[in-house]
């Protein structure tokens, strides 16, 4: 039985107990959430990987994506980025390698990290097909499904696929005249294959085959959105919404078969449409956990898109998004380096936490309250400990202050906390 099937029977598993303790909720709450699809548990057959729960009533999670894209990229170089993501406390890792020793990279990640790993099998399918046929346009549906099963069997916790990107959706996008037609790497290659071969999406027409694989290995499905908007001007157009409607139907089919599923989302969304986007997914996809890429509420911040993403991510988390895919400062302009990865995770974690505070999550609220108490007491060591990035907080303080008992250099002797403590403290 899969985890979802066990939850439907009311069986509380070791994975449910583990994530319940981490989240500060009852195991029964987790079991019920998994059973009705509001919560998914990302876990692996690999003993070194600890489960992570994503969904309604839980802390908002953050995922960091790495992978070999350029010829100069190496396994060791990407592992250094993963180390940075882990140090920054990303909840999950996605290996999105498209070239080089992809299988070696995936095995290294799966055997090294202690948190769930996700993949997008189409990436390796394209690489293998190009080597095998000379062009990825000649790949077959069997190539796609064989790669999905291969990666599922190796212990990945979740796989991203594009089953909702159908020919009708593609023609809808073409007719609408988008500003930026496609920005999904996997989605664009799948669409190119579909149009070249005049063939419907095999992930849609043979969806039962996909479900069988995921059920066999109890892998969480992550429905990727090939039609996610590439700029805020294209947000919530007909193609995006039509794909979401299709995904909603597939969510129900996956659940009925005993497979956990979450839905991925944009991307570029103006601030006033973020809540609507989240609410639409929750409605059309029957409350499935929502995994958003950002969101990015402006297209004009190249070099600072980790900040853009944090702004949109906080709004999305508050509106009900459950999972944030990080965005680095290098987004739209180049491949991220180790520091970019670290900064991207931190920015997304801040967004996730801000959203959790606004939602009134007890752990998040207590964290901020504890920091406020430490600040009033000018307890620097406790403030460092409670900071989302303790190392950076303490480093900056040490560079500019001299004593653990004094005010910081921001206000100096005019420190508001110190003045209040001296003259206005109530006995």
UniProtKB/Swiss-Prot annotation:
Keywords: 4Fe-4S, Cobalamin biosynthesis, Iron, Iron-sulfur, Lyase, Metal-binding, S-adenosyl-L-methionine, Zinc. Pathway: Cofactor biosynthesis; adenosylcobalamin biosynthesis. Its EC number is 4.1.99.23. Binds 1 [4Fe-4S] cluster per subunit. The cluster is coordinated with 3 cysteines and an exchangeable S-adenosyl-L-methionine. GO terms for biological process: cobalamin biosynthetic process; thiamine biosynthetic process. It comes from the Bacteria. Its cofactor is [4Fe-4S] cluster. It catalyses: 5-amino-1-(5-phospho-beta-D-ribosyl)imidazole + AH2 + S-adenosyl-L-methionine = 5-hydroxybenzimidazole + 5'-deoxyadenosine + formate + L-methionine + A + NH4(+) + phosphate + 2 H(+). GO terms for molecular function: 4 iron, 4 sulfur cluster binding; lyase activity; metal ion binding. It is an enzyme of class 4 (lyase). Pfam families: ThiC_Rad_SAM. Belongs to the ThiC family. 5-hydroxybenzimidazole synthase subfamily. Together with BzaB, catalyzes the conversion of aminoimidazole ribotide (AIR) to 5-hydroxybenzimidazole (5-HBI) in a radical S-adenosyl-L-methionine (SAM)-dependent reaction. Is thus involved in the anaerobic biosynthesis of dimethylbenzimidazole (DMB), the lower axial ligand of vitamin B12 (cobalamin). Requires BzaB for catalytic activity, as BzaA alone displays no activity. This is 5-hydroxybenzimidazole synthase BzaA. It comes from Eubacterium limosum.
């Amino acid at each position: 039985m899969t985890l979802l099937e066990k939850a439907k029977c009311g069986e509380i598993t070791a994975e449910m107990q583990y994530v319940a303790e981490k989240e500060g909720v009852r195991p029964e709450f987790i079991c019920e959430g998994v059973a009705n699809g509001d919560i998914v548990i990302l876990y692996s057959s690999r003993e070194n990987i600890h489960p992570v729960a994503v969904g309604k009533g839980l802390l908002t999670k953050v995922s960091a994506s790495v992978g070999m894209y350029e010829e100069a990229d190496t396994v060791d170089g990407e592992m250094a980025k993963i180390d940075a993501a882990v140090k920054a406390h990303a909840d999950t890792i996605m290996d999105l390698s498209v070239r080089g020793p992809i299988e070696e990279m995936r095995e290294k990640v799966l055997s090294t990290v202690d948190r769930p790993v996700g993949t997008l099998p189409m990436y390796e399918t394209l690489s293998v097909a190009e080597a095998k046929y000379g062009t990825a346009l000649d790949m077959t549906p069997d190539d796609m499904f064989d790669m999905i099963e291969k990666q599922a069997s190796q212990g990945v916790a979740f796989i991203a696929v594009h089953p909702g990107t159908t020919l009708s959706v593609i023609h809808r996008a073409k007719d609408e005249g988008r500003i930026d037609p496609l920005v999904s790497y996997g989605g664009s290659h799948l669409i190119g294959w579909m149009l070249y071969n005049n063939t419907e999406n095999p992930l849609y027409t043979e969806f039962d085959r996909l479900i069988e694989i995921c059920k066999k290995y109890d892998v969480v499905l992550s429905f990727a959105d090939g039609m996610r908007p590439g700029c805020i001007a294209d947000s919530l157009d007909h193609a995006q919404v039509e794909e979401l409607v299709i995904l909603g139907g597939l969510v129900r089919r996956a659940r009925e078969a005993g497979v956990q599923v979450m839905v991925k989302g944009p991307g570029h969304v103006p601030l006033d449409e973020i809540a609507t986007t989240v609410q639409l997914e929750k409605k059309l996809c029957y409350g499935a956990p929502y995994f958003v890429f950002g969101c990015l509420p402006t297209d004009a911040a190249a070099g600072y898109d980790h900040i853009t993403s944090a702004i949109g991510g906080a709004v999305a988390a508050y509106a009900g998004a459950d999972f944030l895919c990080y965005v680095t400062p290098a987004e739209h302009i180049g491949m991220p380096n180790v520091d970019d990865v670290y900064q991207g995770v931190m920015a997304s974690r801040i967004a996730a936490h801000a959203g959790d505070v606004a939602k009134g999550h007890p752990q998040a609220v207590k964290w901020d309250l504890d920091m406020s108490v430490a600040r009033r007491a000018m307890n620097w060591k406790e403030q460092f400990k409670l900071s989302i990035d303790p190392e950076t907080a303490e480093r900056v303080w040490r560079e500019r202050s001299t004593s653990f008992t004094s005010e910081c250099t921001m206000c100096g002797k005019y420190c508001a906390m110190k003045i209040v403590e001296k003259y206005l403290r109530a006995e």
